[in-house]
């Protein structure tokens, strides 16, 4: 918010127009949780509603400061009457009524919207607009908003059965007061801080539970700078020159593999599991170079190559963990298969052996 305000001030100083910031909370939280879980990242929004509410009020105060409101109009989007009343009093106290407006959704609590419109002297009402044949999309939109706003902690959950002074009202009042008390203490630091350039990769212990390897968070500028450097360096590397092998070279390679079988057998399951964990750690340490190589050699996009590195690490850790699982050996007899050729497909050169 502060960065946007500073940008808006600079824009106006150069003859441009101001901007508007809409303060809204709770929207698309389910999607944020799914996205974080799929990629192995911390959830970007605050983990608790109390923290979200506290930060909302902090942003409201920042937006209502006259020196900021002059350049940035503020939209207070909420159905929580406590928040709306708070914003109404705050904008009046700061003398910025004409720079702060209230916003609500059509179909959520229309009787409440009418009262807010009268008390605030105006209201921006949002409604989905679709062709008649696409009406189901409008219903889906409202159902999603209803789902987001009617979880037990939310104001709308209690709105229709709540009266001032009853238990539900008091619970909402206490939530509001706790958020106010945390306004200046809630963290403003980003929750996603992954840094591929400085991360430390450690070998997992044998008893570590299996967890999917996190993908690279490309929303973080330092990660983008990291991979740009890796890809640029790879462009200066000439493609490998591979001599054509003849029958003698093939026989030599096969003999080398055959000679190594005794050492591989001597490792046992514990040794092989350790080796696989070392492979996983090595892949993680060389993620940038592997991505750049796949981009250069196989024409993969950076995002796809990054996910493939994560998948390769997962394979190594998963099978290493499997050696410690009693079910892996249940009723099985293991016999050496001999020499096996591993030829990965062109489109998954790393993760699929």
Predicted regions and their residues:
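Short alpha-helical
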Residues: 82, 111, 289, 311, ...
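Conserved short loop/turn motifs at secondary-structure junctions
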Residues: 1, 78-79, 102-105, 276-281, ...
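Charged, low-complexity surface patches
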Residues: 105-106, 135, 283, 305, ...
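Conserved coil-to-alpha-helix start sites within the AMP-binding
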Residues: 345-353
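Terminal low-complexity tails and localization/encapsulation signals of metabolic enzymes
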Residues: 121, 132-281, 285, 292-293, ...
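Positively charged, amphipathic and often flexible ligand-engagement surfaces
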Residues: 1-205
């Amino acid at each position: 918010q502060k960065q946007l305000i500073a940008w808006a001030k600079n824009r106006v100083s150069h003859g441009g127009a101001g901007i508007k910031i809409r303060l809204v909370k709770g929207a698309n939280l389910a999607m944020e949780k799914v996205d974080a879980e799929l990629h192995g990242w911390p959830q970007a929004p605050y983990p608790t509603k109390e923290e979200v509410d506290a930060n909302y009020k902090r942003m409201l105060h920042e937006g209502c400061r006259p020196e900021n409101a002059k350049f940035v109009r503020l939209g207070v989007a909420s159905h929580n009457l406590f928040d709306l009343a708070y914003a109404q009093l705050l904008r009046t106290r700061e003398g910025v009524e004409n720079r702060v407006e209230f916003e609500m959704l059509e179909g959520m609590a229309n009787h409440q919207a009418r009262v807010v419109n009268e008390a605030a002297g105006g209201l921006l009402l949002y409604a989905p607009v679709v062709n008649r044949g696409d009406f189901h999309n409008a219903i889906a939109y409202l159902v999603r908003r209803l789902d987001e706003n009617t979880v037990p902690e939310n104001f709308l959950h209690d709105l229709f059965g709540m009266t001032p002074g009853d238990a539900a009202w008091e619970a909402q009042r206490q939530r509001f007061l706790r958020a106010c008390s945390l306004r200046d203490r809630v963290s403003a630091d980003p929750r996603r801080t992954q840094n591929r350039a400085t991360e430390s990769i450690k070998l997992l212990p044998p008893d570590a539970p299996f967890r999917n390897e996190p993908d690279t968070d490309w929303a973080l500028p330092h990660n983008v700078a990291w991979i740009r450097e890796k890809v640029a360096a790879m462009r200066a590397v000439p493609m490998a020159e591979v001599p054509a092998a003849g029958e003698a070279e093939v026989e030599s390679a096969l003999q080398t593999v055959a000679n190594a079988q005794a050492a591989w057998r001597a490792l046992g399951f514990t040794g092989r599991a350790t080796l696989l964990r070392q492979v996983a750690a090595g892949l993680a340490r060389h993620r940038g170079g592997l991505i750049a190589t796949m981009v250069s050699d196989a024409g993969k996009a950076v995002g796809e190559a990054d996910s493939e590195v994560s998948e390769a690490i997962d394979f190594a850790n998963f099978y290493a963990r499997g050696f410690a699982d009693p079910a892996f050996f249940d009723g099985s007899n293991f016999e050496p298969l001999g020499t096996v050729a591993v030829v990965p497909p062109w489109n998954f050169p790393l993760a699929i052996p």
